[in-house]
Amino acid sequence: MPKFAPLAAAGLAALAFAAAASAETVLRYTEPSVNRGERAAAMNWFAAEVAKRTNGALKINFFWGGSLMDARSSLKGVGDRAAEMGSIVGSYTAREMLPYNVGDLPVGSSDVWVGLRAMYELATTSPDLKKAFDAANVVYLGNFTTTEIQLICKNKVLSKVEDFKGVKIRSAGFYGQVMESLGASVLRFSGTEANRALDAGTITCNHNYLYGMRILRDYEVAKDIIKLDWGQHLAWAVIVNKEVFNKLPADQRKALREAGSAMVDKVAELMISANDNALAAMKAGIGGHKVTVHEFPEAEKAKLLKAGEKFIAEWKAKTDAAGYSADRILAQYRALTEKYEAERKAKNYPWKR
């Protein structure tokens, strides 16, 4: 159940927004996660940038841990102005955010920065994505990522797609569907429960990310990392209420846009570093627990991508039926992925130039 009464909360938010407008404007930001880790650091950096770029005239006040509303309520809550800003997860708003959910399909780059920049440009230039955000009464400002999908397994090494058959794997989203189609027995529950499930033998492998394996201590109960480097979950956005955004002075709207774009690079920098550090630490050993890393062969990864085509077709059918052009979205997304991959190869990451 949502943690707010929409009309009452929207009224309170409007009063708070109006009262602050004479001196400084404070935007309430609903965030389901806690104020800890690399993504939270990027969000705090974003808020500081907004304040700096507006000389303190525009500020963001985070409400962490779902204290205003839960993750499933964020899109509607921000659209109804129960909070001025928030983070949304595309899989929780599959119907409303069909075009944006292209970022969760197993088609994009597994490079964190390339994926984030491609999604940012798509979300800020695609007429289809703009239509979806407009319908929700929100404006897109920036993007997050889970980073690339990996597996950590207990007494099991997967080296080809045939190895998925019969393996119990905790997974989610399109990636879980692909593994299921390959014969895996996919269980869907919170990643925070995976450690106990691995230890108990309820699952053999967990779909996770390198930094997540370290945080959740998967390495304590499972020793084999299958480095799939397979796509990312990129349908994860920063949004602001459209009416609130449009009423801000032009310089403040510009500051929000520019800080949102800059935050995309900051998220990439922090997440890539977190993954690198986590992998190095787990390989070296943490508290006596070491992992072995197994690179999934490129030829087999190509088969994974091929297996995902069925689910792309399903997304396309739903997206077209909802009045969008799935082919146009996919073509632009793929072109942007190629654009930023070429830039990365030519110039390296922005923070390394």
What residue spans do the PLM features occupy?
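N-terminal secretory/targeting leader peptides
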Residues: G11, E24-L116, T124, D128-R353
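N-terminal signal peptide c-region/cleavage motif recognized by signal peptidases
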Residues: A16-A20
